[in-house]
Amino acid sequence: MQLNPSEISDLIKSRIQNLQLAATSRNEGTVVSVTDGITRIHGLTDVMQGEMLEFPGNTFGLALNLERDSVGAVVLGEYEHITEGDTVKATGRILEVPVGPELIGRVVNALGQPIDGKGPINAKLTDKIEKVAPGVIARQSVSQPVQTGLKSVDSMVPIGRGQRELIIGDRQTGKTAVAVDAIINQKGQNMFCVYVAIGQKASTIANVVRKLEENGAMEYTIVVAATASESAAMQYLSAYAGCTMGEYFRDRGQDALIVYDDLTKQAWAYRQVSLLLRRPPGREAYPGDVFYLHSRLLERAARVNADYVEKFTNGEVKGKTGSLTALPVIETQAGDVSAFVPTNVISITDGQIFLETDLFNAGIRPAINAGISVSRVGGAAQTKVVKKLSGGIRTDLAQYRELAAFAQFASDLDDATRKQLERGRRVTELMKQPQYAPLSVAEMAITLYAVNNGYFDDVEVARVLAFESGLQQFVKAKAPELVAKITDTKELDADGEKTLVAAIAEFKKSWA
């Protein structure tokens, strides 16, 4: 085929006319100083707060301090190769992380990059890590339960979908154990889980992931890990990244549970970043906005109404509410709940589960202090059967603790007091539960009914847990239809009660 010169010139002209050249104008600055992962940059005049900055060597940073003649930024990742005089580009984008079902079963870092060696994550969507919490009109009251499978939690401090329930206690009191048990118990409950590990040892996180895998919980769980060896900036951002991943499910009419383990270390990381950015320190050297640090994170956990979900999904999902339930963890120093960060988070959340060192060391695990642990909104969401049967448990325990303190000094006790002490000892023993062994609603109902009606009163304290285990196995074998009915309806009617009483009486005869 031969082309004449005029055709060639026409072809070239048409190619030139159709050439798509997208010219982008990006602001550039110069690195003035680099210290401990914090850079000062001169010349970025129109950068936004929280904007991503591009450093040489495919490294990114986050603009946090906007000053008159310079910008203070944290480097996300390695910063050893960055030197004074390097060019920094503004990207015009706020920090985003991948979201969606593709992340389920994976372990990622604070930027959503996989760190579990299972290959890349092909997520179709990304979302901003900093988002405004749903407004008052978009919310719906908490009315559906989150079953943790722990007798002491579900009976005394129930948690509802969309609630923020703080887990607080000293180190080594079983805070992570309560949170991990709650995740394991969500199997088959249509609940997606996000576990955010902040500032923990890599070996500890690996152990949690292994336990979740062994119990089949990684099938619905995302793990976001910012280990102790990572930069303070990554530890500070990881909680927001995890929250964004959880919000993906909430906004599409599904339910999600997020555990922040723990927010004390996140506050420490933020304090470190703030001091390096030369922000003025306040109480305990924290910056002035440390309350806002946690409030803007925890307010994003909410139950949103069907209108919000329908609007968000452009009518694809109708008649469904979505929820994000948060279980933040706070570590106290020598039981001091009046320190700065614990009081802040207590005031933000809808209740707290307080774990005590003394109870833990006495072998009462989970070591929940019934007196000062509360759930402000969970009562409305509690399963009907558990709510009906657990009314006396909290009172029994609280009165027992008070009487036990007096009984140490009193030599002669009247029968009523002695009976109350005996009941209290058995209830305390009954609230013990091994790790990774959550109970179903039916199993919990059997136990609570038996203790409320005095069936444990003549059982030796040392044999209470054996009696409970035997009773549950017996009822499940003798009355499987009752167990199935309680599981389905979450209620115990008069007929069910008769069947249960007969089964317990029969078991007590055979118990020796």
Swiss-Prot record:
Gene Ontology CC terms, in alphabetical order: plasma membrane; proton-transporting ATP synthase complex
- UniProt catalytic activity: ATP + H2O + 4 H(+)(in) = ADP + phosphate + 5 H(+)(out)
Q: Where is this site: Required for activity?
A: S373
Q: What does the organism's lineage look like at the top?
A: Bacteria, Pseudomonadati, Pseudomonadota, Betaproteobacteria, Rhodocyclales
**Know the name of this protein?**
ATP synthase subunit alpha
Per the record, the major location class is membrane
For this protein, the Enzyme Commission number is 7.1.2.2
Gene name tied to this protein: atpA
Q: Which CDD domains match?
A: ATP-synt_F1_alpha_C, ATP-synt_F1_alpha_N, F1-ATPase_alpha_CD
Question: Where does this polypeptide localize?
Answer: Cell inner membrane
Its quaternary organisation is:
F-type ATPases have 2 components, CF(1) - the catalytic core - and CF(0) - the membrane proton channel. CF(1) has five subunits: alpha(3), beta(3), gamma(1), delta(1), epsilon(1). CF(0) has three main subunits: a(1), b(2) and c(9-12). The alpha and beta chains form an alternating ring which encloses part of the gamma chain. CF(1) is attached to CF(0) by a central stalk formed by the gamma and epsilon chains, while a peripheral stalk is formed by the delta and b chains.
Mode of membrane association:
Peripheral membrane protein
Its biological purpose: Produces ATP from ADP in the presence of a proton gradient across the membrane. The alpha chain is a regulatory subunit.
Q: Which UniProt keywords apply?
A: ATP synthesis, ATP-binding, Cell inner membrane, Cell membrane, CF(1), Hydrogen ion transport, Ion transport, Membrane, Nucleotide-binding, Translocase, Transport
GO: which molecular function terms? ADP binding; ATP binding; proton-transporting ATP synthase activity, rotational mechanism
By sequence similarity, the record places it as follows: Belongs to the ATPase alpha/beta chains family.
- Cite the InterPro entries for this sequence: ATP_synth_asu-like_sf, ATP_synth_asu_C, ATP_synth_asu_C_sf, ATP_synth_F1_a_nt-bd_dom, ATP_synth_F1_asu, ATPase_a/bsu_AS, ATPase_F1/V1/A1_a/bsu_N, ATPase_F1/V1/A1_a/bsu_N_sf
Binding of ATP, residues? G169, D170, R171, Q172, T173, G174, K175, T176
